[in-house]
From Swiss-Prot:
Family the entry assigns: Belongs to the class-I aminoacyl-tRNA synthetase family.
Sites where the protein binds ATP: K626
Primary site of residence: cytoplasm
Alphabetical list of NCBIfam families matching this protein: leuS_arch, PRK12300.1
Location within or outside the cell: Cytoplasm
Key words, A-Z: Aminoacyl-tRNA synthetase, ATP-binding, Cytoplasm, Ligase, Nucleotide-binding, Protein biosynthesis
Name used for this protein in its record: Leucine--tRNA ligase 2
Amino acid sequence: MNNIAYKWQTRWEEDKIYESNPNPSKPKFFTTVAFPYPNSPWHIGHGRTYVTGDILARYKRMRGYNVLFPMAFHYTGTPIMAMADAIAKGDKELIETFKDIYEISPDVIPRMSDPLFMANYFKEDIKASMREIGLGIDWRREFTTIDPEFSSFVTWQFHKLQSKGYIVKDTHPVGWCPVHHIPVGMHDTKGDVEPEIGEFVLIYFNSEKGIFPAATLRPETIFGATALWINPSEMYVVASMLGKKMILSEKAAAKLSFQIDDIEIEEKIKGSKLVGLKVENPITGKHIAVLGADFVDVSLGTGVVMSVPAHAPFDYYYSKKTFKNNNIEIIPVITVEGLGNALAKDVVEKNNPKSDEDLKKLTEYVYRTEYNKGVLRSDLGNLIREEYRNELKSLGGLPVPKGRELITNFLISKGLGRKIFEVMNKPVYCRCGTEIVVKILKDQWFLDYSNKEWKELARKSLSKINVIPEESRKDFEFTIEWLEKRACARTRGLGTPLPWDKKWIIESLSDSTIYMAYYTISHKIKQYKLSPSKLTQEFWDYVMLGIGNLEEISEKTGIPSNIIKEFREEFLYWYPLDIRHSGKDLIPNHLTFFIFNHAAIFQENLWPKAIAVNGLVLYEGKKMSKSLRNIIPLRKGLKMYGVDVMRIAVSSTADMGSDVNFSESLVKTVGETLRKMYELFKSLDNYTGDILGFPEKWLLSRIYEITSSTTRHMEALELRDAVNELLFVFSSDLDEYFGMVSAEGREANNKVLREVLTIWLKLITPFAPHLAEEIWHEILKQKTYIVNEGWPEVEGSKMDELTLLEHEYMKRIVEDIRSILNIFKGTPKLIKIYALNDSRYMELLRDAIVANGQMKKFMDIHKPKSREDARILQKIFNESLEIDDKMKKLVTNYNINEVDVLNKLSKYIRRKLNVDILIEPYDEEVKKTYNKEAMPLRPAIIIE
């Protein structure tokens, strides 16, 4: 099969069928998939997003659209630099991965210490992967993000953002690599993890040795603090910090030095030496003890935490272990209606946790419940020291969120605390291997995603975007709301210099937000050999926004006006972007930035129309990782399993938002089904029948029904449902057809079979284009490319709804009989089917269906005259509630006689059951003899 794939990939490329140019006579469809970082080869997991985009592009092309599907490569930022650095340092694990898993020559690997060599090497490798998996890309438009022509476009973009006030110089917390001294985002970290920055509140507890700054996410619980926890096994320091002598963990002091200037270590001390000290609660004035607990994470916050047993499951659980006599002080602070005022204590007692993992789950429940439903107790004033009581009198009865805000502001205003920042999803590691910290960055350039005006534009844009799957919309909405300032430049890495401050390089998630617009004209820059110096701000203003005087711009740039106009027209032909494909992990950054930046720069009619996000690819149920040794390089996978099998397996065997589970059994099933279809096409000439009977009408109707449902699935990107119908349901339909003609003792109809299979071949083309092209040319002897053929139309087709519904009715009867046979003792010799032959019963069922579940309405029409009438009407009404939509359609749209239908289909029923059958009209004699009653669509079935 791979020879077939290579043959057609070569032919398509030679004939340039994916090179797309404006064609005003056709509707356009512009689709893009995130361009890749060329810092390693692709494995099978990379294929999903790209094949999904390709399948949709191929489908739209067959629907008559002029489709543009381009590709480029993302050289910007630190991903490539970090990988090259690792090679230069002799990173054993990485070198072994390249050598053993990806089979890169040992002679080549050392040369990858040069970032550009690495990027260019893997660019060609990834490009080969894209070609080999059959992506129909217009390669004329290819570029890299360090091409000077593209840099001129990014420079223009940043001038636009700055002119609108969306780029600011500010002080702000950022994820930070302590080794490289640069801000770090998702694409700079191992595993592409976005550092999530959150706030802790420090509360200052005085002691004779200094201040213990307890770090908390819940400052409102300070009133219930009964102790402080520290880790007795770890090192702590006495440090001069913020003009105060503070006691915190050694690791915390090192980490906080990136947020607080001039921290000086005066003394190092073992945590165990601090246990037993007394500290003063700054709000209540109460003196409490410092206790030791190994569960305290000294790298989180300050390594000092409050113990609030009433509201923290960990604190209650470990207080019980510490105070063996169970003499635990409980000071309730928060009341939850119906759940009392000491929720942590109650849930620990009730659930009896066995591990820290159990305690974490209880903690999440308590924190969430108290935050959403809790209020501060009304008599809170009794716990507050007198000097603050008046200022804090409004706290009692407040909902927890408001109480938290009030007490935080109070602590800071009185000098009793401050805020610090933490990586909430720690540990997150830079690609160099260093753990990320939070740094308060001064004089840094930020994209100000907190700008209210800009947020509103993003919300408006999102409201017009078709998000696939729709349930991902809430993730976009959430991201838009929480996004704040984001560092947009680094002092290290590849990329475009910040135009007004060239010591900074624009980072990778900031130069990749509107590059889709650049695709529309990138090939023309090459075609006309335009130098980057000619691609001025005025040039881009005109091409992208229609701003400026064409003749003046032509004179200034030296580019003929007709060429500039050609650029503008091509851009307007393709834009807006019709759909953007990416992994769902990029919603919290790239995809939302994509929305923001388009909304900021382009007019509303050029905003993106749709975004499709997909899940990951697992291997045998597990995430692919080096440690599990379960990574399959994509190019190797294509050789092992076949191109079209891989395309289907990685893209179309799970819902869009779910993870695909790639497995040996999956690819085997897909491969066997494709091969079965291939063999059937090869054997077409063996079928010589010409009878057009019920089986042929049914098969023709089925292929058009499948065409209709596949079209619906493709429009919604429900690829799993489409593949299920095309491969597995249709394969079963073919078995059914051959079974029916066999029951009639005749050959299959060659003409019908050829027509049906040709329609199927077109439907499967977006998924398996290589196999489809081979069959189209070599077996069906066609001269055109099937990938350029039109999509099958259902309108005016040979679909016979009654035939489909009669077959569905037969299927239902067979299922009923089989369920009886399952409990039948002995060997059945004859099955008697007694069906109603009285049209009045079918009319009653029709009326019951029309009543749509309203029994009174149904009974009012038919008014039972006896108990027996009422019983029968009740049974028919119940039947109307139980039957599916297809059977309802059969009853309401057609006047069928069940006996006639069953007699017509009796040969097929007999073959399915492999038992003699007798079909007779139902009458009262049957009821007397067998004590069985027939109802509409429910014949009486007797097995002898």
